[in-house]
From Swiss-Prot:
Cell wall formation. One of its GO terms (molecular function) is FAD binding. Its EC number is 1.3.1.98. It comes from the Bacteria. It catalyses: UDP-N-acetyl-alpha-D-muramate + NADP(+) = UDP-N-acetyl-3-O-(1-carboxyvinyl)-alpha-D-glucosamine + NADPH + H(+). Keywords: Cell cycle, Cell division, Cell shape, Cell wall biogenesis/degradation, Cytoplasm, FAD, Flavoprotein, NADP, Oxidoreductase, Peptidoglycan synthesis. Pathway: Cell wall biogenesis; peptidoglycan biosynthesis. Belongs to the MurB family. This is UDP-N-acetylenolpyruvoylglucosamine reductase. Residues 12-174 form the FAD-binding PCMH-type domain. It is found in: Cytoplasm.
Length: 284
């Protein structure tokens, strides 16, 4: 039975896969990966920073959305990889553990956030990681923070064949009302500046350097609202490409390349995509 990935990505684009695997816990995830054996597969969290080809993919997809348990251990928190970031932020607020407020409103799972070292407003999730449990060569093992590289929208996990299963994170005590005030401020800013009313895959491009703001650069080129097919540069924030109506993978890819070309011509800067791209069953 085929499953449409367009039903599982926030931008509402994606072809069909023959197998969609939804493990209920870490143990069933481990079993599923071992059962798949030589069958090619890709891991998916909540599909929020992902662009998938329209054609059918001859792979299995393992989605971690049911791995969403959180366990508190003093000022440390053990989180399963499929846990939505929003849920973790609300849990931390109730537990009066501060630091991750900047992530409130970032869509996606904890595993996906660790994979790309998600961040916003000067904070990055990698700052709070104590250890990560991964599934490697069919077995689960823990990596300490000293064994993990985190960079700007980058991590060890983009370079090696391992699957994030659980994360141990460390936070500091903070009053609930202080945490809530920060979270309210961040979500207000997101609502004001980001196109949360339309399907998208989030911020499309990485910032090439600290003083170069991609959205402002694209806006300066007069490209807000520019459209190819159903894919459109957001009129609210030029760093986002939205699905304005029946957009295809090809529409979005053409728009990405068009923007990269124009920015290169004007500013001499090569933009790299932040959004993950699946094409021919591979990550790009």
């Amino acid at each position: 039975m085929f499953e449409k990935l367009s039903c599982h990505t926030s931008i509402k684009i994606g072809g069909r896969v023959k197998y969609l695997v939804l493990p209920n816990d870490v143990f069933s995830l481990e079993r599923a990966i071992n059962v798949l054996g030589d069958v090619p597969f890709q891991m998916m969290g909540l599909g929020t920073n992902l662009l998938v080809q329209d054609d059918d993919l001859d792979i299995a997809v393992v989605k971690t959305e049911r791995l969403n348990q959180i366990e508190i251990k003093g000022e440390k928190v053990l989180v399963e990889s499929g846990t939505p970031l929003k849920r973790l932020c609300l849990f931390l607020m109730e537990a009066e553990l501060g630091g991750l407020e900047f992530a409130y409103g970032i869509p996606g799972s904890v595993g996906g956030a660790i994979y790309m070292n998600a961040g916003a407003y000067g904070g990055e999730i990698g700052e709070f990681v104590e250890a990560v449990e991964v599934l490697r060569d069919g077995k689960r093992t823990w990596l300490s923070k000293n064994e993990i590289f985190f960079g700007y929208r980058d991590s060890t996990f983009k370079r090696e064949k391992s699957i994030i299963t659980r994360v141990m994170m460390s936070f500091k005590r903070e009053k609930k009302e202080v945490i809530k005030a920060k979270m309210d401020d961040y979500i207000k800013r997101r609502l004001e500046k980001q196109p949360l009313d339309l399907p998208s895959a989030g911020s499309v491009f990485k910032r090439p350097r600290e003083d170069f703001y991609v959205g402002k650069a694209i806006e300066s080129l007069g490209l807000k609202g520019y459209r190819i097919g159903g894919a459109q540069i957001s009129e609210k924030h030029a760093g986002f490409i939205v699905n304005a109506g029946n957009a295809t993978f090809d529409d979005v890819m053409k728009l990405i390349e068009f923007v990269r070309k124009k920015v290169k011509e004007k500013y001499g800067v090569e933009l790299e995509t932040e959004v993950e791209i699946w094409w021919n069953g591979r990550r790009w």
